[in-house]
């Protein structure tokens, strides 16, 4: 009888362990069987496995970049930095950012570390490199590489961002150029099953009256505010990625500004003195070519020339989202 009892107890323990494992891994349809356990190396030289170390049971944001990119990657990194600042100390504890290089031969850990420092990246955000073929497979599994696209063609890399909660199986593809508050809300609230307690209870009666922003203001908020401010104080400018644009239409010639907005990459290649000075002043982060047309250029300059623009609230100026209640 004692032997039977011991055997039954052992079976129950084994069953409980199996159920625990199933609960940990089986609640999500996207688990170890789907995600490759790609070996990667971060900017500090730490070797990590994609599934085991980086995403298992975590809320994450994942994008693919390369440091030699002069078009969209700098703006993408700057926008995600805004999101990181909004989330505050929760990044690295409750959620994690990963930027994976698609040019691992050039993007060594040392290069990635220097790149992260240029953008004043905080804790909880890893920049990763590894084997090209393995990273290519990872891009495909995450839906960020069309099988018809040559993975060697870096100019065709996806600009989308993958955010998700591996434990619940919630995954979505979003634009990194989305409003930073919306991205922060998705990462900090909706993907976390709204576990953050609201610090205040606001009344709709106290809500400010909404106004329709001008086309120029919309352009500034969506294309420029990740790197530029309007009327920032000296303390904020010490961490700035680009110059403050308050009064820029009075400081620069109109023709220079128009061309700079249309083709900053070409002006840098031509070593325009002002463009080169700005490039050196701001950690060699080149302004990306945003593909603005003439109508957009004029709308943006019109907004920047408006004195009221200097008082426009800056994206990213709000305090971090509240910490989760304990």
Which stretches of residues belong to each language-model region?
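Structural microenvironment flanking redox-active thiols in thiol-disulfide oxidoreductases
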Residues: 76-138, 253
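A short beta-strand-turn-helix
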Residues: 39-59, 208
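The canonical Cys-X-X-Cys-His
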Residues: 70-73, 161, 216, 222-231, ...
């Amino acid at each position: 009888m004692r032997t039977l009892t011991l055997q039954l107890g052992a079976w129950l323990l084994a069953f409980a362990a199996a159920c625990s494992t199933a609960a940990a891994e089986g609640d999500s349809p996207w688990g170890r069987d789907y995600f490759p356990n790609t070996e990667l190396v971060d900017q500090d030289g730490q070797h990590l496995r994609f599934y085991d170390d980086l995403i298992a049971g975590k809320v994450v944001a994942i994008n693919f970049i390369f440091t030699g990119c002069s078009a969209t990657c700098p703006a993408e990194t700057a926008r995600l930095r805004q999101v990181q600042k909004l989330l505050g100390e929760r990044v690295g504890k409750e959620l994690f950012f990963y930027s994976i290089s698609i040019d691992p031969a050039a993007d060594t850990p040392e290069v990635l570390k220097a790149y992260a420092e240029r953008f004043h990246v905080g804790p909880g955000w890893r920049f990763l490199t590894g084997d090209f073929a393995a990273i290519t497979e990872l891009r495909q599994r995450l839906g960020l590489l069309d099988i018809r696209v040559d993975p060697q063609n870096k100019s065709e890399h996806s600009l989308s961002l993958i955010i998700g909660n591996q434990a619940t199986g919630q995954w979505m593809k979003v634009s990194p150029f989305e409003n930073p508050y919306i991205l922060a809300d998705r990462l900090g609230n909706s993907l976390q099953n709204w576990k953050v307690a609201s610090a205040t209870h606001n009344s709709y009666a106290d809500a400010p009256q909404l106004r329709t922003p001008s086309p120029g203001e919309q352009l500034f908020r969506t294309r420029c505010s990740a790197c530029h401010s309007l009327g920032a104080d000296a303390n904020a400018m010490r961490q700035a990625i680009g110059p403050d644009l308050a009064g820029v239409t009075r400081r620069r010639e109109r023709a220079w500004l128009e061309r700079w907005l249309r083709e900053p990459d070409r002006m840098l290649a031509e070593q325009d003195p002002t463009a080169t000075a700005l490039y050196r002043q701001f950690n060699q982060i080149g302004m990306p070519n945003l593909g603005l047309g003439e109508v957009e250029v004029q709308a943006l300059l019109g907004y920047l020339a408006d004195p009221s623009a200097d008082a426009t609230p800056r994206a990213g100026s709000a305090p971090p989202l509240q910490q989760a209640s304990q």
